[in-house]
Amino acid sequence: MSGNTIGKLFTVTTFGESHGPALGAIVDGCPPGLALSEADLQRDLDRRRPGTSKFTTQRKEPDQVRILSGVFEGRTTGTPIGLLIENTDQRSKDYAEIARRFRPGHADYTYLQKYGIRDYRGGGRSSARETAMRVAAGGIARKYLRERLGVTVQGCLTQLGPIELGIKDWMAVDDNPFFCADPERVPDLESFMQDLRKAGNSIGAAVTVVARGCPPGLGEPVFDRLDADLAHALMSINAVKGVELGAGFASVMQHGSEHRDELTPEGFASNNAGGVLGGLSTGQDVVTRIALKPTSSIVVPGRTIDTEGEPVPVVTKGRHDPCVGIRAVPIAEAMVALTLMDHWLRHRAQCADVQPETPPIPAANR
């Protein structure tokens, strides 16, 4: 299997399966001298960790990360950073019934068609369990971006099923189990999710991630545009079915006179571009939004076929998220941070000496 590495200069390779003994990652290209400890990575892992609320999967994993290499006396050495998280709460017996039948909406069928073999225990490599390592690796990128460049990356839930959510208070995001920046709507979310659980069903969601403080010029046209690489990174997250930057699909309804982000001596007048023009960052907030499908791991009976091609019923057992979008917030943050980190190193390698005659202009008022 290839395709397990992301990045050009700041690379992350992950390994491991949902019910294997452990998950791991190799982070290569991190500059030396960055103060780094396991505690620096644990905060975001705890935000993603399963079993932290009644609205997510009840699989109990401590997700304690270990740094195996690349750090000496509390600082990165410039060598590959090895990360490891042990799996401790596998219940593989829950998946015995699907060993020879395909769950609709999952990768069971496609993995078997491609490889001729599949790990049916919790989806194996295709499980979102793999994203724990992305969050750990993303913690390294986030720390570097924040401390060396002043770049911050923050996400929140902006829609859960029919409930649209505003971004009213970023400080409230970590104070509720939904990563919601619209705290007045939290009771509505709780009520909706309780009804959903009773029905044994699932729901989709949307997550918005905003990166602030990005310097202008990040991106490599034409095929490694910043927006293209952000879309690539975000689409690699399990269950993501769509990615927007800035106004996104709403651009279809805008006139050019509205959509263009006019430049003034005081700064950009708007940010419909989402902080990227011509594949390069503008210095404005980089604003991304992802749509996540509802998981098909539900107890509502459905139809499928077995490995012999015969029709069989399917009811998913095991422990699953009724809305995968909730725990996707720290995952999406990590993927944005990893992309920005890689592009910063690439920009620095080629354009460190560039001094444009026009200084950067301020971002639009948020």
Swiss-Prot record:
Keywords linked to the UniProt accession: Amino-acid biosynthesis, Aromatic amino acid biosynthesis, FAD, Flavoprotein, FMN, Lyase, NADP
Q: Which InterPro entries match?
A: Chorismate_synth, Chorismate_synth_AroC_sf, Chorismate_synthase_CS
GO MF, any single term: FMN binding
Residues annotated as binding NADP(+): R48
Q: Which reaction does it catalyse?
A: 5-O-(1-carboxyvinyl)-3-phosphoshikimate = chorismate + phosphate
- Give me the residues that bind FMN, please: R125, S126, S127, N238, A239, G278, K293, P294, T295, S296, S297, R319
- One Pfam short name: Chorismate_synt
GO terms, biological process: amino acid biosynthetic process; aromatic amino acid family biosynthetic process; chorismate biosynthetic process
What are the EC numbers?
A: 4.2.3.5
Q: Which cofactor(s) does the record list?
A: FMNH2
| Highest taxon listed in the record's lineage | Bacteria
Q: Name one GO cellular component term.
A: cytosol
Pathway of this protein? Metabolic intermediate biosynthesis; chorismate biosynthesis; chorismate from D-erythrose 4-phosphate and phosphoenolpyruvate: step 7/7
Q: Which PROSITE patterns match?
A: CHORISMATE_SYNTHASE_1, CHORISMATE_SYNTHASE_3
Q: How is the cofactor bound?
A: Reduced FMN (FMNH(2)).
Keyword NADP among UniProt keywords: yes
Tell me its family. Answer: Belongs to the chorismate synthase family.
Subunit annotation: Homotetramer.
Q: Give the protein's biological function.
A: This reaction introduces a second double bond into the aromatic ring system.
Protein name according to UniProt: Chorismate synthase
